[in-house]
Amino acid sequence: GAGVDIGTGVVTTVGRDYEDKTYIYHPTTGKIIPGIQLPCWEEALLTVKEAHEFMPESAVLGWDIAFTEKGPVIIEVNGAPGPKIHQFADKEPKGKPIFDYIKVKSNRTYNPKQNTL
């Protein structure tokens, strides 16, 4: 995985695998990973936001998106996404700011049995 600036869609870190090996160059394309602009980023965000409206009971969902020549395509949605990969890529914890934001936006109480807010 690699860190992505959610506001711009620009990759902000080197790639990193689960063995903590880092990649400056993409292993398939050979392109330098940091600085890559993900294509049709705004369209991808809109696609995810619209799809999430069909699942309002889930405050947090993990979206796997493919960037194709025809635009972004949802591969799958995860009801209980693991934050490990995002923290692993950036080498910093993400939990507190995200959960503070979710609590404010959702105005709901966390239910550990359902893993939802």
Residue spans of the language-model regions?
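C-terminal active-site "lid" helix and adjoining low-complexity regulatory extension at the edge
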Residues: 24-46, 53-58, 67-117
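Short, surface-exposed charged micro-motifs
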Residues: 62-64
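Phosphate-binding site of ATP-dependent enzymes
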Residues: 1-17
